[in-house]
Amino acid sequence: MDVTIQHPWFKRPLGPFYPSRLFDQFFGEGLFEYDLLPFLSSTISPYYRQSLFRTVLDSGVSEVRSDRDKFVIFLDVKHFSPEDLTVKVQEDFVEIHGKHNERQDDHGYISREFHRRYRLPSNVDQSALSCSVSADGMLTFSGPKVQSGLDAGHSERAIPVSREEKPSSAPSS
């Protein structure tokens, strides 16, 4: 008897990227055939399903860069205006919160909310932190690093979010 060996992830129609599209930030923006018939599309072949990986990478993914001179966070917030965003620094953490109230769109009513928390390196100068949102919806949070012998200062404070008119220079994944 021949048995095909498959990784269990490919056998499950409820894998990590499937059908989570029903519950992600694109909820209410239209459905694909495989959203409605997950078991039918997975029984034909798991390899014929359209990949949602690209969609997942393009939606709400953050990138953290920490080099010798600077600490930077890039976060896709294209569904939020700067007024909908709150950025706070508490001790060694930066908290980014976005929420907009329920509003009507082409498919009904929709509301979105997210909360991200990142640990700041101990040598980031917290008095020189900045945050901005580019025209294409990319939030950039950055701060310079200080020499290890200097005190970076730790307290709670809000960071204002400014709007930039040009698109982000962050690399796309």
From Swiss-Prot:
Residues 144-173 are annotated as: Disordered. The modification Deamidated glutamine is found at residues 6, 50, 90, 147. The modification Deamidated asparagine is found at residues 101, 123. Keywords: Acetylation, Chaperone, Cytoplasm, Eye lens protein, Glycoprotein, Metal-binding, Methylation, Nucleus, Phosphoprotein, Zinc. The keyword Ribosomal protein does not apply. The modification Phosphoserine is found at residues 45, 122. GO terms for biological process: lens development in camera-type eye; negative regulation of apoptotic process; protein refolding; response to heat. It is found in: Cytoplasm; Nucleus. Residues 1-63 are annotated as: Required for complex formation with BFSP1 and BFSP2. Residues 153-167 have a biased composition (Basic and acidic residues). Heteromer composed of three CRYAA and one CRYAB subunits. Inter-subunit bridging via zinc ions enhances stability, which is crucial as there is no protein turn over in the lens. Can also form homodimers and homotetramers (dimers of dimers) which serve as the building blocks of homooligomers. Within homooligomers, the zinc-binding motif is created from residues of 3 different molecules. His-100 and Glu-102 from one molecule are ligands of the zinc ion, and His-107 and His-154 residues from additional molecules complete the site with tetrahedral coordination geometry. This is Alpha-crystallin A chain. It comes from Perodicticus potto edwarsi.
